[in-house]
Structure formats: C-alpha cells, structure tokens
Amino acid sequence: MAPKRKSGVSKCETKCTKACPRPAPVPKLLIKGGMEVLDLVTGPDSVTEIEAFLNPRMGQPPTPESLTEGGQYYGWSRGINLATSDTDDSPGNNTLPTWSMAKLQLPMLNEDLTCDTLQMWEAVSVKTEVVGSGSLLDVHGFNKPTDTVNTKGISTPVEGSQYHVFAVGGEPLDLQGLVTDARTKYKEEGVVTIKTITKKDMVNKDQVLNPISKAKLDKDGMYPVEIWHPDPAKNENTRYFGNYTGGTTAPPVLQFTNTLTTVLLDENGVGPLCKGEGVYLSCVDIMGWRITRNYDVHHWRGLPRYFKITLRKRWVKNPYPMASLISSLFNNMLPQVQGQPMEGENTQVEEVRVYDGTEPVPGDPDMTRYVDRFGKTKTVFPGN
C-alpha cells in the first residue's frame, strides 16, 4: 500500500497569538521659555553660526586708552583696598570684577506677525574657550619677586582664586544677589548693587538666599561678580556653565581646544529660543591676582572669552495675539501720567461695584452681597 500524505498544516508554522506592542505616544507640543514649541524648519538656510568674543570687565573701564592715565589697568582691577574694621568695608568700584555681557542681533525671520505660527532662532550648541592663557607665563614683570630678600628669582605669576562662568540664552541671564557680609558698603555709582534693585539697605537674608534680591544681566560691566550669581530657580531659556577654584596661591588651570562643543539642548531636545531675534552672551573669567613689588597691592586679572554659537530655525506658536498688539498700540498712544495711587498697598479706591444682568428690587439695598472665590452668591444679613 502506498504511503498516505499527512494532512493539515505544517507543525513548523507559528501563529501570532496577540498583536505586537505599539510605542506609546509622547507629547510633541512643548512650552519652552514661554513659547509653544512646534517643528523644526528644514532647508539650506535653516542653520547659521555666529562668532564673537567678550572682553573682561575687572573694574577698569576700556577708557582712557592712554597707558599712563589708567589704560595700563585694562583687563585688571585697581589695587584691592582692605576693610579697616568689621563695620567699615567699602570697596572701590574699580576693584570689583563685574559680568561681561552682549546681545547679538540675528537676522529677522518674520515679516508678518499676524500668523498663527512664527519662526524663531534656537541656540543649539556653542564652542567657547578662554583666550590668552599664555600671557600668564610672563614672570619678568614688576611684580613681587620670589626671592624677596635679594630681589632675585622671578616675578610672582598670577595666582589665587579663579572663577569661570559663561552663559548663552535667548534672554538676559537671571541673577540672584548674595553677599558675604551685608554690612559691606558698596558704592552705587557705577555698579548695580542689591540696594539698587530693592531700594533698601541689605539685610541678613542677603547673606543667604533672599527671594527679593533678583536682577537681570542687562548692562555690561555693571554687576559685580561677588554680589550677583546665576539664578538656578530661573534661567529656563538660558544655559550657563561655571566652576570656581579658591585659595590664595592656587595656580591657574586652563584647558583649551577648538574641538570641544557644548550642547545647549535640554532633556526635551529644545535649546534656548531667541526672542526678538537676539542671542545673549555672558561670561566672567577671573584668573587670580598679581602682587605688585613696592606696596604688595593685589590686582585681579581677567581674560577674554571666545564664542561660536550654532543656531537653527524652529516653528513656534505666535505668542503675540493681534488683540494684545492692538491694545498695546492704543495704550501707548495715551499720555503717561503720574497720579495718586489707585493700586497696591496705598490704594485710594474705596469701593467697586460690578453689575451683571437684572434682579428684583431688593428690600434692603444696603445689604452686603458678594460672590465668593467659589463663584457662589453670598448675602451678609445685618446683625443686631
């Protein structure tokens, strides 16, 4: 008898018992820096690079340029003056290193601001380094000699406390005020102090974190580094990086290369959005101090910083509705007046009545009626 062919389906076949899992959907719409972030703009002109540098602001301004009338101190501070007592500490403004900052204007992207979506520049990455570290090898100047007895050896190089911070953002850097001693008397002419912002003398809370002592880095060479620090509670639209090395004889340590790129994107893949077609750069680079030979006076030394920023275009939802633009236009046409206070703590407004719809005539028109915070109508009955 001939062999019978086996019937049925091959046993090697396996059926999928259940559907394959699908990736869970994730939110595409992000709100970043006050903007609703949409897709990227693609194309040959959607990426641009900008190179710039910031010079140090150690206390001595760029002018005068004469090397005999103060220009020789550019890049340095003037001699640091010590306090005579705990209650008499008044440093000179030209001895205080301050923040360097600048705003780079970017090409305009939107001719029509009435559209639902707008294009905006987004900072993607930055290459940066401190320039001029080789100048610290100068050991033949008129500084304090290493052999103080015979005035021989070499000139003491720059050394001491070092502070390096740089920031790239779509808005000015947010700063938090914090000082070592609230009794310090900073001069308000020429620099921005905590008293300049709060209009009050410093208090003990300014030696820790005082929530009201905040500012924005909106002026170059005006915000002392020992007073103003990057605010970690803000700066959502800014990236900052920094390090500090303390000590009276700490040697400067610097690494420099043109191959290191710092990515500015956050965990959602979005970088600082440049509002108003402008990107803001900020930095401080303090290398230490030099000690003069005659009077043992200390001068802070700062170096410039180079930036190369890469930006790309991104679509965002228009944050400026036409109603608000027209409203601000009409409001700006009205004259600005300064009258008596009608808002705030010293308001002179006694009573405000708001009517909505109609109702039967009440028997007691003076009865207090109001709507509470939950939207319910309340009536206060008169007492005896």
Swiss-Prot record:
Entry's Gene Ontology molecular function annotations: structural molecule activity
Coiled-coil boundaries: none
Superkingdom of origin organism: Viruses
Cellular localisation: Virion; Host nucleus
Gene3D superfamilies: Capsid protein VP1,Polyomavirus
Pfam families listed in its UniProt record: Polyoma_coat (PF00718)
Motif, Bipartite nuclear localization signal: chain positions: 4-18
InterPro entries reported for this sequence: Capsid_VP1_Polyomavir, dsDNA_vir_gr_I_capsid, Polyomavir_VP1_sf
Domain notes: A DNA-binding domain overlapping a bipartite nuclear localization signal is present in the N-terminal region of the protein and is required for efficient virus formation. The intrinsically disordered C-terminal arm interacts with neighboring pentamers. The unstructured nature of this region allows to make different interactions depending on the structural context: pentamers present at the 12 icosahedral fivefold axes bind five pentamers, whereas pentamers present at the 60 icosahedral six-fold axes interact with six pentamers.
Protein name, entry field: Major capsid protein VP1
